[in-house]
Amino acid sequence: MPELPEVETVRKGLERLVVNQEIASITIKVPKMVKTDLNDFMISLPGKTIQQVLRRGKYLLFDFGEMVMVSHLRMEGKYLLFPNKVPDNKHFHLYFKLTNGSTLVYQDVRKFGTFELVRKSSLKDYFTQKKLGPEPTADTFQFEPFSKGLANSKKPIKPLLLDQRLVAGLGNIYVDEVLWAAKIHPQRLANQLTESETSLLHKEIIRILTLGIEKGGSTIRTYKNALGEDGTMQKYLQVYGKTGQPCPRCGCLIKKIKVGGRGTHYCPRCQCL
């Protein structure tokens, strides 16, 4: 699943490709992917111009002025822009024909991606209802609320970080990475972390997600940005996907276990339970 660095990289590519472009028509091959009123979706966007492409957590926000199209890539979603003819592909599900003759296509092998049309004035309430936490930046991701959230939870730390309430944008890859960096076992109960562990974890979340954005995200399986390029963050991962390889810090072999139903990579020596 694309996580925050990957989605931000897609956003940057879309910003270059489609901002200030007007929608001429829309074709939807898989109607179930549109989670708001389908007819409203079909008639509201043609004639509108993409003013900005923004991001909140793992959500892409196409700003059309009064309305915003909220897009979630889920497991395999990606956007492609074709300047002329669009090739046949059974995994192309939404087509946004632009007035300049090009077509923005949404591709999704799993068909898990979602689209919603939301009034811009309702966007804050939309994300409040989803209980989406702050962006992982030094300005918005404050230590005190994060520390309090951990102290009040009896959940293991990994599932808690994955649920997006304390901080937005973390997925399986980057949770493994930040927990390794902070030397915290993924099964540790959140309310058992010390203040120093919580402080280090907070700093590493900001540092690693920022690095992920700088490196264009991680291409592990199929991820590419909107320009068709691979990310390079996979070259900087320390534990994710490294089962049986030496820990870069201590040399102990990396192990993989299940935590909350998710495959989880950690160092048994650095991250004691």
Swiss-Prot record:
One annotated GO molecular function: zinc ion binding
Source superkingdom: Bacteria
Cofactor note (record): Binds 1 zinc ion per subunit.
One Pfam family matching this protein: zf-FPG_IleRS
Keyword tags: DNA damage, DNA repair, DNA-binding, Glycosidase, Hydrolase, Lyase, Metal-binding, Multifunctional enzyme, Zinc, Zinc-finger
Cofactors (names): Zn(2+)
UniProt keyword Ligase, yes or no: no
Record CDD domains: EcFpg-like_N (cd08966)
Active-site residues, record numbering mapped to chain: P2, E3, K58, R262
PANTHER family: FORMAMIDOPYRIMIDINE-DNA GLYCOSYLASE
Record-stated family: Belongs to the FPG family.
Protein name: Formamidopyrimidine-DNA glycosylase
Gene from which the chain derives: mutM
